[in-house]
From Swiss-Prot:
This is Casein kinase II subunit beta'. Keywords: Phosphoprotein. GO terms for biological process: DNA damage response; maturation of SSU-rRNA; nucleolar large rRNA transcription by RNA polymerase I; regulation of cell cycle; regulation of ribosomal protein gene transcription by RNA polymerase II; regulation of transcription by RNA polymerase I; regulation of transcription by RNA polymerase III; ribosomal small subunit assembly. One of its GO terms (molecular function) is protein kinase regulator activity. SUPFAM superfamilies: Casein kinase II beta subunit. Pfam families: CK_II_beta. It comes from Saccharomyces cerevisiae (strain ATCC 204508 / S288c). Present with 7160 molecules/cell in log phase SD medium. Regulatory subunit of casein kinase II/CK2. As part of the kinase complex regulates the basal catalytic activity of the alpha subunit a constitutively active serine/threonine-protein kinase that phosphorylates a large number of substrates containing acidic residues C-terminal to the phosphorylated serine or threonine. Residues 1-29 are annotated as: Disordered. Tetramer composed of an alpha subunit, an alpha' subunit, one beta subunit and one beta' subunit. Interacts with FACT subunits POB3 and SPT16. Interaction with YTA7. Gene3D superfamilies: 2.20.25.20, protein kinase ck2 holoenzyme, chain C, domain 1.
Amino acid sequence: MGSRSENVGTVTREGSRVEQDDVLMDDDSDSSEYVDMWIDLFLGRKGHEYFCDVDPEYITDRFNLMNLQKTVSKFSYVVQYIVDDLDDSILENMTHARLEQLESDSRKLYGLIHARYIITIKGLQKMYAKYKEADFGRCPRVYCNLQQLLPVGLHDIPGIDCVKLYCPSCEDLYIPKSSRHSSIDGAYFGTSFPGMFLQAFPDMVPKHPTKRYVPKIFGFELHKQAQLTRWQELQRLKLVEKLESKDVDLTKSGGFKT
């Protein structure tokens, strides 16, 4: 829309106005105005590399938006704003605070729609392309041999936890290295994405590594009894903490505090 457009029809140089005709351009160009789509601007932000572009047709299909109406205020405005279909006159009459709220709601709604879109056939294909390029990073575990990671949320409800990265090799979760990525809401990727992805692309399921690191001292493995003793001590400490949290006094007969 006009609020996100940038006029490139004229160029100002040393106080003089140079018309578009003086600038070498493609003869096929029939417009002097370039419009940045909201989705393009969103995806272009630093830290948004994990997201793929959701088709506008998917966003405007009411069936795909079921149960999302109450997640933001002025739902219809937000949907129109995301797909650049909101009338300029409405935007011009909004206060600065309302525009900021609209932008915030748009990012939230796009994220929640994104979580649904990436488990569709089209969405999985787009995320597959990003996975092949390791856009989500690689597993830091040495024996996983730079296995590509997949984004996942621990909750489907926004505002609970940030996105995590799942390794299909060691099947463990990791926190993104960049603070820009680690602050993204996990609900924008959902809890089902890795499972759906690996089911859709079974060839991407790696062989689980059998090699594990074994601690050694001067080349010798730790004695099994020493390992068992440490494990037993750890379990004892956990039990003590659990009992104390339930007001059990371990120094008295019967245990319970009076």
